[in-house]
Regions:
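Short N-terminal segments immediately surrounding and downstream of signal-peptide cleavage
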Residues: 1-13, 99
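Short acidic-glycine-tyrosine-enriched beta hairpin
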Residues: 53-70
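Extracytoplasmic/periplasm-facing segments of secreted or lipoprotein envelope proteins
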Residues: 9-26
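N-terminal post-signal-peptidase region of extra-cytosolic proteins
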Residues: 22-25, 52, 71
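Short beta-strand His + acidic residue motifs that chelate non-heme Fe in jelly-roll/DSBH
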Residues: 27-29, 47-48, 72-79
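Ligand-binding loop in jelly-roll beta-barrel domains
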Residues: 70-93
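Short, conserved beta-strand element in jelly-roll/cupin
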Residues: 31-47
Length: 102
């Protein structure tokens, strides 16, 4: 099954997505274009399929972590219950206009 990713906020600074994974659900292979922070809402194991192989990551509810842009993976819920986390993608800040220019 496919994980469910409703976007809660999408503006010029961030994209905030709540990811919900039934047991065995996955994101599909993707590459992160932005730096991001993940805040797990549940505790459990995720299996990550990366270009370098598979890794199992243990999420702990409330323990946030940061990753840089460019990460490539497929994320799979590897435990028996639902897995939920909030992902905050951080968009680059546009430089202010030069002095005297509109």
């Amino acid at each position: 099954p496919q994980a469910v990713p409703p976007v809660q906020v999408d503006n010029d600074r961030v994209v905030v997505t709540e990811w919900r994974f039934a047991p065995g659900a996955q994101t599909g292979h993707h590459r992160h274009g932005y730096d991001y922070v993940v805040v797990p809402m549940t505790t459990g194991a995720l299996r990550l399929e990366t270009p370098d192989g598979e890794v199992v990551s243990q999420l702990v509810a409330g323990q946030a972590y940061y990753r840089g842009g460019g990460v490539e993976h497929n994320v799979i819920n590897a435990h028996e219950g639902e897995c939920v986390f909030v992902e905050i993608e951080i968009k680059p800040v546009a430089p202010p206009p030069a002095a005297g220019k509109p």
